[in-house]
């Protein structure tokens, strides 16, 4: 018994030092307990992504024995290349490498895609937890990780929730530039996302957030308190950790209040920066919620054939033009996987005139 206890104590001898190192805020880069999970997951995802982007063989994404190539070695470039989603034949099944009969089968069915996205999602979730952990150690408020939850929610929406709703990981977003655009086009064709209010909020958040960031940065830069001569860089007028303000918020407030109107300008630096954080974050949250609802086919608004004249005849509108564009994109994607999309097979088509008749 004494021998066993001595062996256990020798094995755990370095444990307190390891715990101290992991949770120390004096390290150049904070590790943290979430970092212990984050680091191997993100490294695994990055390594598999790079190898698959360079050398993965074609993947039977639609499950119809028509493999789609996405790697450099099979003719793609940085724009057209992607890690192709796992096969529709796999569906929502968890498909680790040991579930396949051979490595060739695993590659053919798109196994690397699942490996990358699962490790990536765990890694970014752990990164968010690590942000909270470091804030806690330093006695800071926890809002950094709350803000980061917006892009995390977006990643979970397109890589996990949407495939769950559609019934197959083959419907997830490909890991590449043109693959992302293809995902966007197909999403518009099948769900009319551009007409979804939550997506509109996300667009407002991205463009509005960029506008507010540019406005804030330019106002601050334009109202710096002079500390240098004309021949020196104005950046030398600031010393890291100085107590006094480096710009005149009263001047910035006065300028913007006169440029627009008084109450359009913040007179409180804290409320200003809270707004700069909360506006894009809430809008991206809404977009993620929109993706999650459309995953289960609660789609954007459509105004197809919504205007009729006194005789009941349909008056074509831009809503019908948009619907025609959606149908065009829908018939072009996965063109060999089905003969007719459900939208086209369900009812009689309605002619929409897009050109004026000849006169004379």
UniProtKB/Swiss-Prot annotation:
MF terms in GO: chlorophyll binding; electron transporter, transferring electrons within the cyclic electron transport pathway of photosynthesis activity; iron ion binding; oxidoreductase activity, acting on diphenols and related substances as donors, oxygen as acceptor; oxygen evolving activity
Membrane topology: Multi-pass membrane protein
Annotated catalysed reactions: 2 a plastoquinone + 4 hnu + 2 H2O = 2 a plastoquinol + O2
Binding, a quinone: 216, 265-266
Entry keywords, A to Z: Calcium, Chlorophyll, Chromophore, Electron transport, Herbicide resistance, Iron, Magnesium, Manganese, Membrane, Metal-binding, Oxidoreductase, Photosynthesis, Photosystem II, Thylakoid, Transmembrane, Transmembrane helix, Transport
GO cellular component annotations of the record: photosystem II; plasma membrane-derived thylakoid membrane
Enzyme class, broadest EC rank: oxidoreductase
Presence of keyword Nucleus: no
Binding annotation for chlorophyll a ChlzD1: 119
Gene3D superfamilies: Photosystem II protein D1-like
Main location: membrane
Disulfide pairings: none
Binding site for [CaMn4O5] cluster: 171, 190, 333-334, 343, 345
Cofactor remark: The D1/D2 heterodimer binds P680, chlorophylls that are the primary electron donor of PSII, and subsequent electron acceptors. It shares a non-heme iron and each subunit binds pheophytin, quinone, additional chlorophylls, carotenoids and lipids. D1 provides most of the ligands for the Mn4-Ca-O5 cluster of the oxygen-evolving complex (OEC). There is also a Cl(-1) ion associated with D1 and D2, which is required for oxygen evolution. The PSII complex binds additional chlorophylls, carotenoids and specific lipids.
Binding site for pheophytin a: 127
Site features described as Tyrosine radical intermediate, chain residue numbers: 162
Subcellular location: Cellular thylakoid membrane
SUPFAM superfamilies in UniProt: Bacterial photosystem II reaction centre, L and M subunits
Propeptide: 346-360
Site (Cleavage): 345-346
Family: Belongs to the reaction center PufL/M/PsbA/D family.
Additional facts recorded: Cyanobacteria usually contain more than 2 copies of the psbA gene.
Function: Photosystem II (PSII) is a light-driven water:plastoquinone oxidoreductase that uses light energy to abstract electrons from H(2)O, generating O(2) and a proton gradient subsequently used for ATP formation. It consists of a core antenna complex that captures photons, and an electron transfer chain that converts photonic excitation into a charge separation. The D1/D2 (PsbA/PsbD) reaction center heterodimer binds P680, the primary electron donor of PSII as well as several subsequent electron acceptors.
Self-association state and partner proteins as the record states: PSII is composed of 1 copy each of membrane proteins PsbA, PsbB, PsbC, PsbD, PsbE, PsbF, PsbH, PsbI, PsbJ, PsbK, PsbL, PsbM, PsbT, PsbX, PsbY, Psb30/Ycf12, peripheral proteins PsbO, CyanoQ (PsbQ), PsbU, PsbV and a large number of cofactors. It forms dimeric complexes.
Protein's name according to its UniProt entry: Photosystem II protein D1
Organism listed in the record: Prochlorococcus marinus (strain MIT 9301)
